[in-house]
A protein has these predicted regions:
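Short, charged, surface-exposed secondary-structure boundary motifs
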Residues: 19-21, 69-76, 130-132, 151-152, ...
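Adenosine-phosphate binding glycine-rich loop
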Residues: 188-189, 194-240
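Glycine-rich phosphate/diphosphate-binding loop of Rossmann-like nucleotide-binding domains
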Residues: 2-5, 83-157
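Rossmann-like adenosine-cofactor binding region
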Residues: 132-210
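Generic beta-sheet signal
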Residues: 11, 63, 122, 157, ...
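Phosphate/diphosphate ligand-binding glycine-rich loop within oxidoreductases
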Residues: 2-82, 199-201
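Short hydrophobic/aromatic-enriched beta-strand-loop microsegments
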Residues: 59-64, 140, 211-215
């Protein structure tokens, strides 16, 4: 926002706000809206951005709502796929990891269904994609070996140990993308990750020319700048 000539009112520590006194989210949003032209909201509770948007007189940008959605990440992910693979033909995209709690894959799966994309989903038992986000054409696996050679995009996301039940803890570390997988993968495929990573994506793959996750991260700045421009200017063309 600053690079675009605007300013930011950061609120990272709620102990200094009325939230610490018991103020509800809706009243907090009404207060912040009186000082700003837009609110970027990250909240631990699923659905928080929708509640905020229902009462806010200014635009709400959802920067992540618990295990719900992460729309701006999905937009930069879509841009990355468009730039490195293309969306003008039928492509295959693999989503791997904790698909139950991974808000980035929730939003991305919604966007990809607007294109000619077949989704391949790889997750530990108990961490599958929520049923409302699946489709009968999806391919579902428990091992990446079953589909790594068939896909154009390998989108890896971490198992979120802070959110999973104790009986699923043994899944940690079992869902990794390895150099051995990439031997089987297409030469034109790409590796993506929303970051941060833990052990599901080893640094030994960073030098693989198919690894685009650091570029993906950099695109985030430009895509989010474009979102602000779209909100604040009617004259800016908005298309991929």
């Amino acid at each position: 926002m600053v690079r675009l000539g605007g300013s930011v009112i950061p609120i990272n520590d709620v102990s200094f706000s009325s939230v610490s006194k018991g103020e509800n989210l809706e009243d907090t949003i009404r207060t912040l809206a009186s000082y700003s032209d837009c609110i970027v909201l990250r909240h631990p509770e699923k659905g928080a951005a929708q509640w905020a948007a229902a009462v806010s007189p200014v635009p709400i940008i959802n920067a992540g709502d618990g295990v719900g959605e992460h729309p701006t990440q999905a937009l930069l992910d879509l841009y990355t796929i468009q730039r490195h693979v293309g969306l003008s033909r039928k492509i295959d995209v693999c989503l791997m990891g904790d698909l139950r709690h991974g808000r980035t894959v929730h939003s991305l799966s919604r966007l990809l269904r607007l294109y000619d994309v077949r989704l391949h989903m790889v997750s530990p038992p108990g961490l599958e994609m929520p049923a409302e986000l699946t489709h009968k054409t999806d391919k579902v696996y428990t091992s990446l070996d079953e589909c790594v050679s068939q896909v154009d995009v390998i989108y890896v996301t971490r198992v979120q140990k802070e959110r999973i039940a104790p009986n699923l803890q043994n899944t940690l570390g079992k869902y990794q993308l390895t150099p051995e997988h990439m031997i089987k993968a297409r030469g034109t495929s790409i590796i993506m990750h929303p970051l941060p990573r833990v052990d599901e994506l080893p640094s030994s793959l960073d030098s693989d020319p198919r690894a685009v996750y650091f570029k993906q991260m950099r695109y985030g700045l430009y895509v989010r700048q474009a979102i602000f421009l779209h909100l604040f200017s009617n004259s800016v063309p908005w298309k991929f």
